[in-house]
């Protein structure tokens, strides 16, 4: 009986991030697209500024990469989140499953692993589909900074 109950525990509650298979690791991504928005770094302070400018490979409507398997060929600056480098990504959104699980928290109620689809995530406006703009439409990147410093407000 106890063995049966163990099997009913979702993998993200029964395994550490390091213990997860590659498929389990990948499935943690909710597909919000927040990682695929360009970030700017202040050269003097190293502060990161978030923009609403989508990577050229991001399909804004679906919040999915157009060329996920070959994304590094198309976008050399694309960053691969791994178990090893996760602690260095302090800029991950507070809603990110990787961040939440690393902090000992559970998945949010709208997460696709719990709901079976991305509809609840989009409904909660977690995804970037309602704020993202195409890189090709941007004239001045500074106009698209979401977390402007006080001096730039």
From Swiss-Prot:
It comes from the Bacteria. InterPro entries: Puta_zinc/iron-chelating_dom, UCP006173. Coiled coil: none annotated. It holds the Pfam family CxxCxxCC. Belongs to the UPF0260 family. This is UPF0260 protein YcgN. It comes from Shigella boydii serotype 18 (strain CDC 3083-94 / BS512).
């Amino acid at each position: 009986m106890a063995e049966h109950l163990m099997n009913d525990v979702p993998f993200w509650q029964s395994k550490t991030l390091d213990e997860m298979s590659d498929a389990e690791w990948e499935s943690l991504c909710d597909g919000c697209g927040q990682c695929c928005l360009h970030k700017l770094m202040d050269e003097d302070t190293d502060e990161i500024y978030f923009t609403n400018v989508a990577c050229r490979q991001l399909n804004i409507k679906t919040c999915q990469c157009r060329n996920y398997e070959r994304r590094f060929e198309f976008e050399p600056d694309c960053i691969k989140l791994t178990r090893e480098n996760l602690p260095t990504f302090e800029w991950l959104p507070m809603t990110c499953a990787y961040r939440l699980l690393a902090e000992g928290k559970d998945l949010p109620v709208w997460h696709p692993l719990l709901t079976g689809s991305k509809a609840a995530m989009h409904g909660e406006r977690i995804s970037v589909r309602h704020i993202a703009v195409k890189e090709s439409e941007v004239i001045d990147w500074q106009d698209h900074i979401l977390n402007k410093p006080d001096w730039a407000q």
